[in-house]
C-alpha cells in the first residue's frame, strides 16, 4: 500500500492544478481537467464502474456493493485544485525516509529550512517517511493526498472482495480552494446518502463543523493629482484602503485566533493613488457573530464613502458557505462511525471545528451530509507543506474500515 500511495501521490502533485479566482470558467484552470482525465483513466484501470467526467471537470465513479445487505450508499470526495497562496507549478516532491527529528533543508540555495523550532509538530514524525516540497512551491497534499487515499482504498477493496461493503461512490471536484467546488456538483447524480471529504490535516482529524464564510471585495476610488499642486485636491486611494483596515480589530486576524474564534483576513491589497483594491475574507462559527462581522465591514465602507464622497468606496460582499454542523448533527451517527473506524485502527479521533471550509460544508446544505476526515498533511498552502506517508496509509485504512462498518451494522 505504501508504494502505491507514494507512486500515485508524487505523480498527481506534479500536475499544476492551482485554481484561479479571476477566471469565470469551470474548472478555472486547464490543469484541473488534465488531472481529472488522468484519474478517469486510472479509475477504469483499477476496475471502477460508471466512471464519468463532465465538461466542468467533476469526476464520478462507482464501486458496486458486494453484499446482499441493504447498505446506504456512501461517498468519498477530494478536490483537484491546489491553493492560490503559492504556486503549484513545477512541484518537485522530496522524499525523506526515516525522519530523524532534525532540520530538513528544503532548498539550500534559497536557505529554506523545515525546522522543528518553527514547526514543533515535526517531533510527532520521528522515524516516518516525510514528503516535502523543494522550497519553491506548495506540495499539494491539500488535497492530492485525499485523491490518492481514495484511489488506493478503492483499489484495495476491489482486490479484497472478502471485505464486504455497500455501494460506494467517489468524486473528485474542481475549484474547492476558491469556494466553487459544489457549485455544479450534481448531488442527485452522485446518489449517495452520506459522504466524506478526505480533506483534513494531521492523523486523527475528524470535523463536522466549519466556518460561516464570506468574502469582501472593496474598491477605493481616489483622485490622482500632481504632488506639486495636490493640496485639497488629491485623494489617495491607497491611504483610503489603509484607513479602512485601521477600523478592523487588530486582534481579530488569523494570526491571533484559534479554536472557535472568528476573524477578518486581508488577503490582498494593491493599487495606486487613483484606485486601490482590497480583498478580505470574513469567518466565524457563530452565525450571529458572522452577521455582525459583515455588518461591520459594510458600516466602515459607508463611513468612508460619506467622508470621501459618493462612489469613493465600492463594496461587494458575498457569502461563500455556512457552518455544516446544523446539517450533520441530525445524522450524527455518520460521525460516530468514523470515530469507531479510527479507534479500530488505533487512531485517536481528534474532533475539532474546521478553521476553514471544505466542499462538505456546501454539500451538506445541498442535502448531502459530508463530514471531513484527515488526509495527513501539515502546513497546507505554503512551501513548508508536507505529509507523512504513514498518515496516508492510515487515512486509506480509515476509508476501507468505514465502508466495512457501514455494511456490518446493517
From Swiss-Prot:
Q: Which GO terms describe its molecular function?
A: metallopeptidase activity; tripeptide aminopeptidase activity; zinc ion binding
Give the record's family classification: Belongs to the peptidase M20B family.
What is the name of the gene encoding this protein?
pepT
Q: Which reaction does it catalyse?
A: Release of the N-terminal residue from a tripeptide
Q: What are the catalytic residues?
A: 81, 176 (proton acceptor)
Binding residues annotated for Zn(2+) 1, in chain numbering? 79, 142, 199
Where are the disulfide bridges?
none
Cell compartment(s), UniProt = Cytoplasm
* UniProt KW rRNA-binding keyword: no
Keywords of the record, alphabetical order, are: Aminopeptidase, Cytoplasm, Hydrolase, Metal-binding, Metalloprotease, Protease, Zinc
For this protein, the Enzyme Commission number is 3.4.11.4
Q: Which InterPro entries match?
A: ArgE/DapE_CS (IPR001261), Bact_exopeptidase_dim_dom (IPR036264), Peptidase_M20 (IPR002933), Peptidase_M20_dimer (IPR011650), Peptidase_M20B (IPR010161)
Keyword Lipoprotein in the entry? The reply is no
The record's NCBIfam families line, in alphabetical order, gives: peptidase-T (TIGR01882), PRK05469.1 (NF003976), PRK13381.1 (NF009920)
Q: Which domain of life is it from?
A: Bacteria
Q: Which cofactor does it need?
A: Zn(2+)
This entry's comment on the bound cofactor is:
Binds 2 Zn(2+) ions per subunit.
* A Gene Ontology biological process term: proteolysis
Q: What protein name is recorded for this chain?
A: Peptidase T
